[in-house]
């Protein structure tokens, strides 16, 4: 959940509505994977969520963690780590989104990070902020 918390902090600090009110990010109380995906979707439906950002520090099956709701705009941050490169995950999940006709925005850092580095790299931060600003009314 460290990546999700870092993304939440970055977005809430840097993205605001036209009246200056910061956007609010909601993190699911459980991780998305298998049966938990339905719990996350149900929780998000009660929180007025309009966009979803999936993050993972590990290689996993993209279809396990992807948001299949047609009601939200999607983005995925794949961690570029020394032990677990997220490029394979990103390619798999982006292909799955494309096969389902769901547009999604991908984020992948240029520089490799250590697995215990929970910071959002500058290039990813710029992509994340731009993506989130595009979701505002």
Please annotate each region the language model reported.
Residues 1-137:
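An N-terminal assembly and electron-transfer interface module characteristic of large anaerobic redox
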